[in-house]
Amino acid sequence: MIKIAFFDVDGTLLNIGSKELSDKTSFALKELRRNHVLLCMATGRGYLSVPHFEGIAFDVLLTFNGSYVKAGEKIIFKNPLEQDDKNRIIENLKNMNRAIAISNEHFIVTNGTDPDLEQYFAFGSETMKIAPDFDDLCDEDIYQIMCSCRKEEYEQILQGTNKTQITAWWDKAVDIIPLACGKGNAVNAVLAHYGFSKEEAIAFGDGKNDIEMLEAVGTGVAMENAKDEVKQRADAICKSVEEDGVYDYCVRNHLIAAMD
């Protein structure tokens, strides 16, 4: 019996760049909740950037790709970047002449801009805020660093760090988080918090940063619009986000009744 459902946001619940759920996706979430299934939003977005959908209350917010997780008002998991690693990454990116974004539960700011980073923010309907005091803010706890880059640059960005990893849902920008985080580890923390087994959980996702989440639950469902690498690691594949894949899967697998 499914007791909790984890959902990626962009490319899973929402079309990339969209702000509103489709009617069927909204219905599916409400029906799952009515059927006593807990809802967890599992996103690479920062805590301040999570979308809010009318009439839908998520029981858990898994943000920063799993670096900061809240169940209601209770923080059940948090793990900022280690100071030395954070400083080294920022130094590496400055040497590469990259604009850098940093974020925690209180702010999300940048030290500059470039087209790919702007598009990254635009996908989440966010505006980049360039902070004059960026270097001072870097001394705060930081859960995620974001920058534009390509896969062949990953090693250069992480050079000299010990406990960091790159996770990506787009091929032109990345999220840099602690090695001990990621959506999979955060899912495990959520399941432990509620006393649920892996088999009592289902997850939906489309990005490479969703793979470990899909593998951490009993049923990992990849969207049809996901990359092949994600589909190969999933237990099932549903229709695309444009075709209301979450709704269709939940109806076909008797998690909810169909809309009238």
Predicted segments — roles?
Residues 56-57, 65, 160-163, 216-217, ...:
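Short, structured coil segments at secondary-structure junctions
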Residues 16, 20-116:
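Active-site phosphate-binding/coordination module
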Residues 58-66, 122, 166-169, 221-224, ...:
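Short hydrophobic/aromatic-enriched beta-strand-loop microsegments
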Residues 216, 221-260:
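Asp-based, Mg2+/Mn2+-dependent phosphohydrolase catalytic module
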Residues 3-18:
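Asp-based phosphoryl-transfer active-site loop
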